[in-house]
């Protein structure tokens, strides 16, 4: 009824060309403030929804971490078996050495030529230096190293070190971010609901009741060092939230600032050319991936020394079995590590949403420390009747959200429209949020 009387009064004033009275502007401000109040409630509700999503993502991360730990244990067991078999084989490497050495001398030229062709075609830069480095590497390598797939073992060990490093970095980021988020989400603002469903005033003085914090909580004592009967300073209460969200996001993104980990594949394929080029430049081991393309190199792998030393054949079989198992679990670990990294990216994105959604409300509320519930104040209203420069059918309104900068809004409606002030308030909030994000 009150809204209807307001519209009737505005319509009569409008058609008569009268200026809108202060009382009518005040009533329009009240109507617009109701919309702003609703949007603030929605924003705070979305903040809590994002918080729930972050918690769900963290639970998924914990399950994934258990799978990672299990895969790591199996991978390490297989690596230990591989190293054990390798050491036992090294103790008897003199067997068949003459046969292997002869084949190795024929294998090296083919391997070098094949590798350099690949490098010139795919990797391109620094072929001369790489060629010299490869020559030294092949001359210093033994056919026995080749025979026991030493390159695969070395690659596996290097990958294991990188995996451990990446996991440590990500866990450190998660631990620091989780500590901050635990403090942020514990039974305070995020667990309380508005008690006044008719008019929610999160920016009023404390005598209305704290809607966010349990005053007895440690966090509440930290951010509310003043007596409850003193005026409510929104900035003092919400600034810790803002700071903590920002700190959590920084912690989560820390690992992304470091050198990214390229998840390798164990086979030589066109899809991992970058990894092969890196290995060739680093220590030439990438060239050994091309042994399948050289006949004499393949013959070394097929040398059978069982006649001279039967136990060596068994040891080699054990080595190959444990090596394949270690490679299998290393690939599984890489897959889980990628999923874990994706959880970090998802959490970081949610923290960004939380930051953006929370910031505009806290910035808006920080503009006032009074008990005035008029979040939106209407200062002037003009249409074609009062200002001929305004096109017919449009209404120009100047408002303020609290004591912010003046916001000019133009809506394709007459003042008498039932949802006029709701549309004005919506456009004003949109402008305010855009400007807040730009700052």
From Swiss-Prot:
Motif Nuclear localization signal, residue range(s) on this chain: 72-75, 433-437
Keyword annotations from UniProtKB, A to Z: Chaperone, Cytoplasm, Cytoplasmic vesicle, Disulfide bond, Endoplasmic reticulum, Glycoprotein, Membrane, Microsome, Mitochondrion, Nucleus, Phosphoprotein, Secreted, Signal, Ubl conjugation
Pfam families: Clusterin (PF01093)
InterPro entries registered for this protein in UniProt: Clusterin, Clusterin-like, Clusterin_C, Clusterin_CS, Clusterin_N
Cellular compartments per GO CC: chromaffin granule; cytoplasm; cytosol; extracellular space; intracellular membrane-bounded organelle; mitochondrial inner membrane; mitochondrion; nucleus
Main subcellular location of this protein, as a coarse class: secreted
Lineage: superkingdom: Eukaryota
Post-translational events: Proteolytically cleaved on its way through the secretory system, probably within the Golgi lumen. Proteolytic cleavage is not necessary for its chaperone activity. All non-secreted forms are not proteolytically cleaved. Chaperone activity of uncleaved forms is dependent on a non-reducing environment. Polyubiquitinated, leading to proteasomal degradation. Under cellular stress, the intracellular level of cleaved form is reduced due to proteasomal degradation.
Subcellular location(s) of the protein: Secreted; Nucleus; Cytoplasm; Mitochondrion membrane
Assembly: Antiparallel disulfide-linked heterodimer of an alpha chain and a beta chain. Self-associates and forms higher oligomers. Interacts with a broad range of misfolded proteins, including APP, APOC2 and LYZ. Slightly acidic pH promotes interaction with misfolded proteins. Forms high-molecular weight oligomers upon interaction with misfolded proteins. Interacts with APOA1, LRP2, CLUAP1 and PON1. Interacts with the complement membrane attack complex. Interacts (via alpha chain) with XRCC6.
Protein purpose: Functions as extracellular chaperone that prevents aggregation of non native proteins. Prevents stress-induced aggregation of blood plasma proteins. Inhibits formation of amyloid fibrils by APP, APOC2, B2M, CALCA, CSN3, SNCA and aggregation-prone LYZ variants (in vitro). Does not require ATP. Maintains partially unfolded proteins in a state appropriate for subsequent refolding by other chaperones, such as HSPA8/HSC70. Does not refold proteins by itself.
Family: Belongs to the clusterin family.
Descriptive protein name: Clusterin
Native source organism of the sequence: Bos taurus
Lineage: Eukaryota, Metazoa, Chordata, Craniata, Vertebrata
